[in-house]
Amino acid sequence: MKKLLIFGSIIVALFAALAFVTSYQQKEAVKDNPYHKKELDPATIEQLDDPNYQNLILPDELEKKLKNKETVTVYFYSPTCPHCQKTTPIVVPLAKKMGIDLKLFNLLEFKDGWDKYHIEGTPTLVHYENGKEVKRIDGYHEEAVFRDWFSSIQHRHQ
């Protein structure tokens, strides 16, 4: 009985230590994060160092751009969305190559964006001009489709 009690105590101590280490790692990962939030979803934490997820736009910043009637192209995505995971490596490098400043809006972290920007599913790319939506594309597509979509918004400015 004494051995069982000692063994049980060791197991409890190991789980407590594991919980502490995991909690500490998550706190360190979100420290000084670009989302300016105290807690982030683990899927977002995984993307913090990914070069495809660096050109973020926060809700206040997007709202300010739209209120100021600026032109902005936004990629609404969720880190847990399988279609976004296939789309991001296509659209982010393509936009950069085409000279489009594609802003990324994380709907997992900022859930109000679903209703506010009328997003029905992810991924969704929306182009705004003078603070108003003028063009949108939803879902996963091949690179050629996104290239044509980006070209169409470029031609609006020529």
State where each predicted segment sits:
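Short active-site neighborhood of thiol/selenol oxidoreductases, capturing the structured segment around
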Residues: 65-79, 91
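C-type cytochrome heme c attachment motif
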Residues: 79-86, 124
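Typically the conserved alpha-helix immediately C-terminal to a functionally engaged Cys/Sec
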Residues: 83-98
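A short beta-strand-turn-helix
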Residues: 51-70
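Thiol-based oxidoreductase modules, predominantly thioredoxin-like and allied folds used
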Residues: 76-78, 95, 99-112, 121
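Structural micro-motif
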Residues: 117-126
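N-terminal targeting signals for export/organelle localization
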Residues: 1-49
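Non-catalytic, surface beta->alpha helical segment in thiol-disulfide oxidoreductase systems
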Residues: 4, 126-158
